[in-house]
Amino acid sequence: MKPIELSFEFFPPKTADGVEKLRATRAQLLPLKPKFGAGGSTQQGTLDTVLDMQKDGLEAAPHLSCIGSSRDSLRAILDQYRSHGIRHIVALRGDLPSGMGEVGELRYASELVSFIRAEHGDWFHIEVAGYPEYHPQSRSPKADLENFARKVKAGANSAITQYFFNADAYFRFVDDARKLGVDVPIVPGIMPITNFSQLMRFSEMCGAEVPRWVARRLESFGDDRESIRAFGADVVTSLCQRLIDAGVPGLHFYTLNAAIATRTICERLAV
């Protein structure tokens, strides 16, 4: 059986201590031989993090968001990435600035994908985002799927999904996408569970559903962090095993710049 491909999400640190913590995290995860590491928030912070990843010998896939950006600014960023030998981009719409309407010259990720292809041809491997439980701002499940298909047909090579805890939601999303002609790999996004309140806050923001039984168990542990981590590792390992058994093309972990939970899950899976 072909080994499952792993990739890890990091976010650019805001402090010197954060930079050192992220380096330590990567050092702990590199033995798992990830296919690439992704990350982004601020443009300069993203570049600094990406260049640091490259020093570790890790292929980097910076996030690139189009909301609030002009074509000229996007062109400059892409040229900069290419000049550093970066071949992998995660193309996103991005979040709308608070209190503002649609801003920037490109409004949708599909337009960003088309722009990257027009500017750089096949130089970049382009990832886009998928939402098994649908984007929280989508008009309907049908509209969300159609938007996903547009991103892929604009020239994306593959997709990474938002995290989820219901494998059936992912399987249904993939089936529905295939019916719309999407034929690229759709890699499931995985969120290790280490903090109950943080998990619920993130899930509320991004529209990911935490099963009631999982939430109730986590809540029952109160401040017992060890029990939360142990139970969380059990839940996420079981989810990953089901996905692997179904033949997913990879697993993409949202590490939150921490290594232990992700490494524990991968070691249990023997991947």
Can you name each region flagged by the protein language model?
Residues 33-49, 94-104, 157-172, 256-258:
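Glycine-rich, proline-tolerant flexible connector loops at the mouths of alpha/beta enzymes
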Residues 10-13, 37-39, 63-69, 94-96, ...:
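Active-site beta-loop-alpha junctions enriched in small/polar residues
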Residues 3-7, 36, 59-63, 88-90, ...:
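Structural preference for beta-strand elements that scaffold enzyme active sites
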Residues 4-23, 60-72, 125-143, 220-234:
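Active-site mouth loops of central-metabolism enzymes
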Residues 19-26, 40-58:
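Glycine-rich, positively charged N-terminal anion/phosphate-binding segment
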Residues 17, 104-131, 180-233, 238, ...:
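Active-site pocket-lining/capping segments in soluble small-molecule metabolic enzymes
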Residues 9, 32, 81, 151, ...:
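Conserved, mostly hydrophobic/aromatic
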Residues 66-83, 103-108:
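Glycine-rich anion/phosphate-binding loops
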